[in-house]
Amino acid sequence: MNIMNTEQSQNSIVSRIKVFEGQTNIETSGLPKKPEITPRSLPPKPTVSSGKPSVAPKPAANRASGEWDSGTENRLKVTSKEGLTPYPPLQEAGSIPVTKPELPKKPNPGLIRSVNPEIPGRGPLAESSDSGKKVPTPAPRPLLLKKSVSSENPTYPSAPLKPVTVPPRLAGASQAKAYKSLGEGPPANPPVPVLQSKPLVDIDLISFDDDVLPTPSGNLAEESVGSEMVLDPFQLPAKTEPIKERAVQPAPTRKPTVIRIPAKPGKCLHEDPQSPPPLPAEKPIGNTFSTVSGKLSNVERTRNLESNHPGQTGGFVRVPPRLPPRPVNGKTIPTQQPPTKVPPERPPPPKLSATRRSNKKLPFNRSSSDMDLQKKQSNLATGLSKAKSQVFKNQDPVLPPRPKPGHPLYSKYMLSVPHGIANEDIVSQNPGELSCKRGDVLVMLKQTENNYLECQKGEDTGRVHLSQMKIITPLDEHLRSRPNDPSHAQKPVDSGAPHAVVLHDFPAEQVDDLNLTSGEIVYLLEKIDTDWYRGNCRNQIGIFPANYVKVIIDIPEGGNGKRECVSSHCVKGSRCVARFEYIGEQKDELSFSEGEIIILKEYVNEEWARGEVRGRTGIFPLNFVEPVEDYPTSGANVLSTKVPLKTKKEDSGSNSQVNSLPAEWCEALHSFTAETSDDLSFKRGDRIQILERLDSDWCRGRLQDREGIFPAVFVRPCPAEAKSMLAIVPKGRKAKALYDFRGENEDELSFKAGDIITELESVDDDWMSGELMGKSGIFPKNYIQFLQIS
């Protein structure tokens, strides 16, 4: 009976198809089921966009299509027998979207869609919904359809639908974007089980990921159709209602993502018209990848693509930090940069010769101001230089008392200072008063009231009544003599020395650069080349560009700072080498640089001499130079003119000290305090000239200007070098300041930690006199350290 019913239905379908072909689209509207077709005609709009209008399919459309299929299934069979080739390709193209989007396009493709391999699962559904009589007929139909479809498959590859749908779009898309679209698909993709029901499709998807973008071929289409046809009979008896529910789900919404993926590989193109929903499913594909092909998942592939193509994905942000270390070796940071206020550019650094480099070395000993400025720029200076308040409060020794009347040096160092002597013991009863003992020397600072004076004793200051002290040097005489003090007079600039005015600020950027400020006066010491000078400013020496200054008096030609050769007349006289640079502050003073050779003309006094350098003559301090040639011993003794201000006794002592070349010298190992008037007191480290050996235990010697006897066990003989040095330098040893000392009176010598003090002379057990930068004065012994003469 089933066969008879099938033949009758086929004959009726054939007749209907013939009538249907002769009719126009208007006739199709005259069918009795027009009201059901009308809602289905709405989806044609999404079908125009080939694959993206998949949003149109809805469960209502499925029901309508099921009713329509019940009336058209017979027609589909007749068309397959008659061999209507144009319809089958349209069927396959619209089968996957559940026959909703593409059916409204044309009535013919809508009829043929029911022949798709998925229709066998829906045929029974439609018939069961229509009537129970037609339920047995769908089972044989899939078999006939398989044969008809397989016979028509040879013509199917020529169908232009497959290449038109997806490949041209996705060929231009990048691989990274395609994989990103996959990542978007899985969360919203409901029809995952449909893809699981077609394992062949999954395998094709896996293999397609590895392929490059080939165009779809007919064989691939045949394989896909054949595989679906084979699987259809198994699905007919299987789960019909679950498939219907899955079709009802909004699977077509993921159609755009499916279209992007198959375009890249070529094996999945046949799945575009048939299985768009399964393709977006990422989890089953990833599982299939890991189990079947054993290759990376899509997410990992996307990460690899982003890492391999950082320019496209923007993941190359981590690369810039690696770039900075590269140019460090190749790049050279500009050594010199023009200051902010400087219009001219800095010239290239000068090329200095070996001699110039040697001369540029910082001297071991410098002036106090030089040493102070250099120490401020170094960490050593920070530790050594301290404020006076810190010095007195923390670790500096206490100032010793001033020399009292009767002391051998009292008249020399205290008479010029306004001071008085306490007549009685004074105990301060009110704040601001000074306490002292009888006989203490009080230095008068100012007169506060009619009967009170502001005085100082050591570190303490306070008021003292006039009746409690005896004034030795009043304040009025001190004030009258003060204007004559050259230390308080304004010292003009040496207009005769080569100098220049700074036009622009020049910040020192190298060790040898001289930091200059606009408006300063810089003394020119050497013209290195046409672009650079070497000069002195604020007791600092360095090089600076010539275009930053305006030269007032230039260095004469031939005197480019290079040490002049000693002329013939130079050899005849005495010479000395400059130990430090010296800039003359008076017109009659001689300016010179460190290391220059000065021709001695005459000695002005004990501290000054007249000399000649670079054709210029002037006076200069002797403690800035070092003798080069031994002073002549025959004829007029040079040293005899060196100390014209000394007394006759001191004169003879100095001459004997120098002339007695075979004199023996010793160094004090321990301090010795005189117990009688004939004893010679000295400190540890002092160098004493032995005048006579009294016996094996006692000797007579001279220390500075004092003579006396001392025990031989307290000293040791000096080496030959020390003897020769002491013979040449009569002033003896040098001392290095350990702490800052600020003289509170004019007779005191102020210095800073690190200064080198010369012309040492012992005043008493606590005080010494010395010279620094042309100034002499007294200072406490415990503030200095004696230097060994080498």
Curated annotation (Swiss-Prot):
Keywords: Cytoplasm, Nucleus, Phosphoprotein, Repeat, SH3 domain
Pfam families registered for this protein in UniProt: SH3_1 (PF00018), SH3_2 (PF07653), SH3_9 (PF14604)
A GO term, aspect molecular function: proline-rich region binding
SMART domains xrefs: SH3
Modified residues annotated as Phosphoserine in this record: S65, S369, S762
Keyword Nucleus attached: yes
InterPro entries membership: Endophilin_SH3RF (IPR050384), Eve1_SH3_1 (IPR035834), Eve1_SH3_3 (IPR035835), SH3-like_dom_sf (IPR036028), SH3_domain (IPR001452)
Ranges of compositional bias, category Pro residues: 336-351
GO CC field: cytosol; nucleoplasm; plasma membrane
One GO term of the biological process aspect: regulation of cell morphogenesis
Biased composition regions of type Polar residues, renumbered to the chain: 287-296, 365-374
UniProt superkingdom: Eukaryota
UniProt subunit comment: Interacts with ADAM12. Isoform 4 and isoform 5 (but not isoform 1 and isoform 2) interact with ADAM9, ADAM10, ADAM15 and ADAM17. Interacts with SH3GL1 SH3 domain. Interacts via SH3 3 and SH3 4 or SH3 4 and SH3 5 domains with SOS2. Probably forms a trimeric complex with SH3GL1 and SOS2. Interacts with SH3YL1.
UniProt-recorded name of the protein: SH3 domain-containing protein 19
